[in-house]
Amino acid sequence: MSARDNEKGSARSQPSHAAASEIENVPRPSRQQSWTGTMIKVFIICACAGIVSKYIIPLDSIFKSVHIDPHDYATRANRILSTTPLIDGHNDLPYLIRLETKNKIYDHEKLPFRTGLLSHTDQIKIQEGKLGGQFWSVFVECATDPNAEIDDPTWAVRDTLEQIDVTKRLVQEYPDLLEYCESASCAKAAFKRGKVGSFLGIEGGHQIGNSLASLRQVYDLGVRYITVTHNCDNAFATAASTVAVGKPDLGLTDFGREFVKEMNRLGMLVDLSHVSHQTMRDILSVTKAPVMFSHSSSYALSKHLRNVPDDVLNGVTKNGGVVMVTFVPSFLKVDDPASATIHDAVDHILHVAKVAGWDHVGIGSDFDGTADVPEGLENVSKYPRLIELLLERGVTDEQARKLIGENILRVWSNVEEIAENIRALGEKPNEETWSGRKWTAAIDIPMPFMFKDSADKRKEL
């Protein structure tokens, strides 16, 4: 700025003596008038804020309603994933951590979760895939000896507790990305905060030692679903893998009915993935709450016993549950797994939706739980492409929202509500034990008796 400009500016900034005199003669408002005027302004601002909050559409709703070319599938998919949490029913990353680091997670050079792992799940892939919530499997395998007695729970329960521990610690280690949750409402709130809600699921009743007392304890530790069986029978039910090797499908046991009843009382999701087809039907006939299949596909499209037959899909509709379609190639295309692609996953989703309805389908990848993946679904980052392809096949935005998260959140909320109602009626914890249970022998030192027949009771141990 030149000196001349400065002079002009200075001249303009100085009022004349006459003008100054006029200003001085203007009556100033009294202190009472100033206070009143301020309060009026505050009232107007508050009133406007109230009107906005009551009548103006929330920002996420505005985003949802912005017009987008219906053929711009990528933008539609991005909008859907940005406003509705994609909640995956099953991911086995904690088990990989167990296998490869013995649950040591704090050395970020040895476990570069932020910068990238060769497996299916890490921070970069999660963010690229717009994952909105994850049921992390705190999986422990069945006994390697197929003839092992199922009442040998010591190591399985111990290892399950370790998996619960490492999963919680993993979530705590990355608080900018993950948020631990034990309820459907928390899952929704975490997504609004920009975090991936992280929930715990146990993959097999063997992991709780076939015990309802253990069931209650893992619930208290935050586990929110249990897969009734894994690839082995237990005290509760027959597994699909048992039927696959030619053994009879005995379905749900009497004790299994007590197990389901107690899960309903607690508010824990009953997961039917891995169970035999008869077990599926039996559980649907006795449960008081909606069920889930955390990672299963359609038996009509691929005759793998891990998949769900159409009659069971119809049963899920009546039950109000959800079938979360998985990406395991042998489940998608049992006759030729190597040729499975993302399009096969789309086919399975559409079939489940056609038979069960769009209110009863979800996504349960089984990422990091299978070495083989379909072409196009190599890892967690591929979810947006999956949604794009579904939209290309005619799926509406509303249907896609139900698929990716609204359905499982509804089921979870319903399970919680039913449990509250059951407990409100005064139902107490189930004290039943499995008939094949081997009780720990009494210690060989004198102990006082509680009853007249105590000696006989102790002989039964």
UniProtKB/Swiss-Prot annotation:
CDD domains: rDP_like (cd01301). It catalyses: an L-aminoacyl-L-amino acid + H2O = 2 an L-alpha-amino acid. It is found in: Membrane. Substrate binds at H230, R306, D366. InterPro entries: Dipep_AS (IPR000180), Metal_Hydrolase (IPR032466), Pept_M19 (IPR008257). Zn(2+) 1 binds at H90, D92, E203. Residues 1-31 are annotated as: Disordered. Gene3D superfamilies: Metal-dependent hydrolases. This is Putative dipeptidase CPSG_01350.
